[in-house]
């Protein structure tokens, strides 16, 4: 599609970035929602969630470089959209953690606080700019190491 055709659907470049960012965030949330409803232990769902988010970020960055760049621009311009996305993910994670507490898998903590801490501890796996800078570094924890560390922090 030519640039002229694109602007028949979008009023500006900013609108293109916003739409792309919303689409990526929607895909991220949908993946998280599907994982949250799997009939697995809370630990396994958290593991799949974190590694899935990382994989989605890496695949976008490597396979769709232009999309990755547009998402980064949208993140910088529309942080309020990212805040809403983080809150939705935190709520989803809190539900998984609550189920893990009820099953005796995790320590008895505030699920909302635990979800925020879990998500924050794994930001290097899903923030596009951080992933881009750290992907090939050998002196960083691997995604598996980070996820296992974060899950162990929730256990009794």
Residue ranges and their predicted role:
Residues 35-36, 51-58, 68-73, 150-154:
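Helix-loop "lid/cap" segments that line or gate small-molecule binding pockets
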Residues 65-72, 79, 83, 101-147:
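Hydrophobic/aromatic-rich alpha-helical bundle segments in the mid-to-C-terminal region
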Residues 41-45, 110-113:
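A conserved beta-strand->loop->alpha-helix hinge within the catalytic CA
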Residues 1-15, 19:
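Helix-turn-helix
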Residues 15-37, 44, 48-55, 59, ...:
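Alpha-helical structural segments
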Residues 6, 18-21, 67, 71-72:
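Feature detects amphipathic, helix-rich regulatory segments
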Residues 55-59, 90, 95, 99, ...:
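Amphipathic C-terminal alpha-helical segment
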């Amino acid at each position: 599609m030519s640039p002229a055709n694109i602007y028949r659907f979008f009023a500006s470049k900013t609108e293109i970035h916003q739409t792309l960012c919303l689409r990526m965030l929607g895909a991220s949330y949908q993946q998280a929602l599907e994982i949250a409803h799997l009939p697995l232990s809370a630990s396994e769902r958290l593991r799949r969630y974190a590694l899935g988010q990382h994989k989605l970020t890496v695949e976008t960055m490597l396979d769709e470089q232009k999309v990755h760049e547009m998402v980064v621009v949208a993140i910088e311009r529309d942080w309020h959209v990212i805040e809403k996305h983080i809150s939705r993910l935190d709520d989803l994670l809190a539900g998984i953690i609550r189920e893990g507490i009820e099953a005796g898998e995790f320590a008895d903590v505030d699920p909302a606080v635990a979800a925020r801490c879990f998500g924050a501890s794994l930001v290097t796996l899903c923030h596009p700019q951080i992933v881009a800078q750290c992907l090939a570094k050998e002196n960083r924890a691997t995604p598996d190491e980070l996820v296992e560390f974060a899950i162990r922090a929730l256990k009794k």
